[in-house]
């Protein structure tokens, strides 16, 4: 294997800017900001969305029904779906 071709993988703190939630993970992303977390100093990476603020993980996700071409055709000509009739 070639030497010195892999980026530096190290522990970093990710900060969700919408909620203020911090978590420690490994990353190769470089940053000049640092933060004290659990008694240690780590590089800080700011993110807009994390598991603490994403609607899927918080339970605030809304599902919308996207009608496809077949559904529109059936609706237009008054046909019923064979799968839902049973």
Swiss-Prot record:
Gene3D superfamilies xref list: Ribosomal protein L31
Keyword Ribosomal protein assigned: yes
GO biological process assignments: translation
Query: Which molecular function terms from Gene Ontology are attached?
Result: structural constituent of ribosome
InterPro entries, alphabetically?
A: Ribosomal_bL28/bL31-like_sf (IPR034704), Ribosomal_bL31 (IPR002150), Ribosomal_bL31_B (IPR027493), Ribosomal_bL31_sf (IPR042105)
- Cellular component terms (Gene Ontology): ribonucleoprotein complex; ribosome
Q: Which UniProt keywords apply?
A: Ribonucleoprotein, Ribosomal protein
Which SUPFAM superfamilies does this UniProt record tie to the protein? Answer: L28p-like (SSF143800)
Which family, according to UniProt? Answer: Belongs to the bacterial ribosomal protein bL31 family. Type B subfamily.
Q: How does it assemble?
A: Part of the 50S ribosomal subunit.
Protein name per UniProt: Large ribosomal subunit protein bL31B
Recorded source organism is Streptococcus agalactiae serotype Ia (strain ATCC 27591 / A909 / CDC SS700)
């Amino acid at each position: 294997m070639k030497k010195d071709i892999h980026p530096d993988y190290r522990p970093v703190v990710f900060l969700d800017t919408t909620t203020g939630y911090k978590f420690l993970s490994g990353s190769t992303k470089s940053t000049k900001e640092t933060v004290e977390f659990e008694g240690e100093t780590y590089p800080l990476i700011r993110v807009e969305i994390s598991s603490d603020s994403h609607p899927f993980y918080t339970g605030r996700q809304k599902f919308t029904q996207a009608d496809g071409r077949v559904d529109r055709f059936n609706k237009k000509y008054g046909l019923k779906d064979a799968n839902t009739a049973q």
